[in-house]
Amino acid sequence: MRYSSARVYGCAGKRAPPGRVNLPSLAGQLVKAGKDWRAYLQNIPESGTHLANWPGDDNTAKLYAVKHNPFPYVAEIQDDPKQFSKQVPLEQLFGDLGSEQVPAFAYIVPDQCRDMHGLSNPLAPCGGASDTDDNDVKRGDDETGWLVDAITGSPVWEDGRNAILATARNPI
């Protein structure tokens, strides 16, 4: 929540927001300024970003974690289907880059295999239950490098009016 609105809304530690936040967000401010935004989410469920992890069964690792995506919690996005639909699969980023149709603000969220702290679930296809913290960090570094290369290698990057801001929640 902090990255999308400069506030934490009571989300201390690993807790998710309380479900609905009725305060301004970065996405809402961009829309008011006539700018576009999109959230590119790795392993997002086909049914959307609803307030759950995905997949929702007990036999599969939950790779998409809504707690890493602030937008489903924001009332002004929840209440506007057009804005809510701007949460898309990460794979769409590459098509958008190739067609030069990227938004003014792109928020990219890796799944729980590539977020630098991984999953302890042996069902997770992250590299096995014997993963170490070092492997989690390496996987996150590799994912970040791969994404930066894709972005900076695209025609969109060539105009020079771009920036990449990468954040990591866990100390490295």
Language-model features, listed with the residues they occupy:
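N-terminal pro-sequences and low-complexity stem/linker regions of secreted or lumenal proteins
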Residues: M1-I172
